[in-house]
A protein has these predicted regions:
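Positively charged, low-complexity/disordered segments
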Residues: 248-250
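N-terminal phosphate-binding caps/lids of nucleotide- and nucleic-acid-binding domains
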Residues: 2-246
Length: 250
């Protein structure tokens, strides 16, 4: 007997699609942190609890989102970064697909508080498993704060595949360090279980970020690289002969 073909409902589609975007807590941090940077933020705070499995909170002072547009953020393929395929050839943002918030909201409890400088009052929206629970005006400063709680609460099978809290924290820390190095113009503060882990100055100097991450001893033993010709430009830092990693014992 032949099998019937089922047309999946939007909720099921979002849960399946979330697996491609949200693999673990570090995936959530990556998408939200990149969104914050793309918003024009100069200051971003990342605050996680229990390796991001319990709570991920990211606040920025970027452009914010208009109250009339807030609900659209959580629709699949809804983005402010492109309008047509032609825009891809002149794209400088970190993301553009418009899948992140839809995927994250499908497998978590999420709250967004946002305000643009053009509006007198901000907007708060709360979703659980893609469903809008509440939307209301709220007093807040310019920018956006997104809080993601109980990741994979409605997909327990996926929650079982998460690593230990320590391992998930290491993944998040590594990701944040890389994004901090790539965006020295952004003051990035990273808090893990109420402990300050990183606080970059946002002075647009790569060496300042390196010092914040690796400390003074390593920074003092770096050599600046700066090369440019007609086709390529290379800049950065390499370690001198005093920096090395001991080989692992055999």
């Amino acid at each position: 007997m032949g099998k019937y073909i089922n047309i999946l409902d939007d909720l099921t589609i979002n849960k399946i699609a979330a697996g491609e975007v949200v693999e673990r807590p570090s995936s959530v941090v990556k998408e939200l942190l990149e969104n914050a940077i793309d918003s024009g933020a100069t200051q971003v705070v990342v605050d996680i609890t229990d390796g991001g499995k319990k709570c991920i909170k990211i606040s920025d002072n970027g452009g914010g989102i208009l109250s009339s547009e807030v609900e659209k953020c959580f629709l699949r393929h809804a983005t402010s970064k492109i309008k047509s395929i032609d825009d891809l050839f002149d794209l400088y943002s970190l993301g553009f697909r418009g899948e992140a918030l839809a995927s994250i909201s499908a497998v978590s409890n999420i709250e967004m508080v946002t305000k643009t400088k053009e509006e007198m009052i901000g907007t708060k929206i709360v979703l659980s498993g893609s469903k809008i629970i509440k939307k209301e005006p709220v007093g807040t400063k310019d920018g956006t704060t997104i809080t993601v709680k109980d990741l994979f609460f409605n997909t327990p099978v996926r929650a079982k595949f998460l690593k230990s809290t320590h391992a998930e924290t290491i993944n998040i820390s590594d990701l944040i360090n890389k994004l901090a190095i790539g965006n020295p113009n952004v003051r990035l503060k990273y808090i893990n279980n109420s402990k300050l882990m990183l606080n970059t100055p946002g002075d647009n100097k790569l060496i300042s970020v390196i010092r914040s991450i690796y400390g003074k001893e390593i920074t003092d033993n770096l050599i600046e690289v700066d090369y440019e010709d007609e086709k390529i430009k290379i800049s950065g830092y390499i370690g001198n002969c005093l920096l090395y990693t001991s080989p692992s014992p055999r």
